[in-house]
Amino acid sequence: EKALSNICSNQALCALRALIHLCLLGKTGLEATARACFSKAEYLKSRLDFVELLNEGPTFNEFAVRLPREADGVIAALRGKGFLPGLPLAAMGRGGPNDLLIAVTEKRTREELDVFAEALREACHD
């Protein structure tokens, strides 16, 4: 019989892609990437003094915040400005309507994080 899905080949391609990426990063590249994600997430957290952090402990590259207004409205406002601000936790059954999960990667610069923080501030107070 012919398979109805190509999930196995998709998994193999994803694994191959991950392997190539890790090889290109080199011996210390994964550690450097992880450190960059961590430090940039901590930097962004320090810029978000107008929201409540839902976890005061250390995080890696994601953290949850409670916004002063509903997350869906803030997300819509920021998407209109070209940002993908995060995931509303309520949609995942993990929080209230004002809770947002934000992720930061090594690809974002501090300048980009500053622009995002200011846009988020404006969206929260519109």
PLM region descriptions:
Residues 23-26, 38, 42, 49, ...:
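Hydrophobic alpha-helix feature that most strongly marks membrane-spanning transmembrane helices
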Residues 51-81:
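Conserved PLP-binding catalytic core of the aspartate aminotransferase-like
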Residues 56-58, 81-101:
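Conserved PLP cofactor-binding pocket of PLP-dependent enzymes
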